[in-house]
Amino acid sequence: MSEKQAIFTMLGGRVRLYRGIYNPTSDAAWLAAFAADTPAKTVLDVGVGTGGAILCLLANNNIKNATGIDVSDKMLAECAKNAELNNRDIELINADIMNWRTPRTFDLVITNPPYFRGTPAAHNAHHNADIVKWMKKSVARVKPRGTFCTIVDARVASDVIAAIAGVCGDISIFPLFSTKHTAERVIIRARVGTNGPTTIYNGLAMNCDMILRDGLTISNTLATLDPQC
């Protein structure tokens, strides 16, 4: 396989990734685009996989210390190669978030959880994971007044919001619409230990080029909204 075939890009070429056991989808770009507006010195990506989300985030946010955790050593090996390809230093931890015992907390925690159903993929050790437990374990790693951000299937968004509402405030809900004009994904951002109001955005189309091609953050996209979005 040639180098051109072996590597694909995200965010208009700003992020380069090796084709491997799992190739990140647009969900990674969307998650990063909403999380990138958060000031943070430290970030944890729960279920980092091959690094798509955290690398997209680092392309738009000058975070000094990045950490990823994943139960799959094969995924982490791919992530390490992708981090090197993008000249990024990411601490990688081979552990299961469901039973990871650590006092460490982070300014920002992001996760693109294994919410999908169907035939388990070899790379997805947490196929059909308990989404509520996953979210609670992830939120537990956020510093007080820090930020949690996730992207989920719209069908489980209410479960996720209910799971984090007891410890989070300032919840922002951002729907992503398919061609059927119904939300297919929902990005959720919240702050731990606050009690601010919930904000629901109008959302954008899932194929919005300003995010996927141009690599803008969601706030920048909304400020210069393209009619096609």
Which role does the model predict for each range below?
Residues 182-229:
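SAM/dcSAM-binding transferase cores
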Residues 113-140:
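Mobile active-site "lid"/loop adjacent to the S-adenosyl-L-methionine
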Residues 3-42, 48-60, 189, 205:
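SAM-dependent Rossmann-like transferase core, predominantly class I methyltransferases
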Residues 130-183:
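Conserved Class I SAM-dependent methyltransferase catalytic core
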Residues 80, 121-123, 161-164:
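Short amphipathic alpha-helical segments
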Residues 14-16, 65, 89-91, 169-172:
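Conserved beta-strand segments of alpha/beta enzyme cores
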Residues 31, 112, 134, 190:
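Residue-level signal for inorganic ion chemistry
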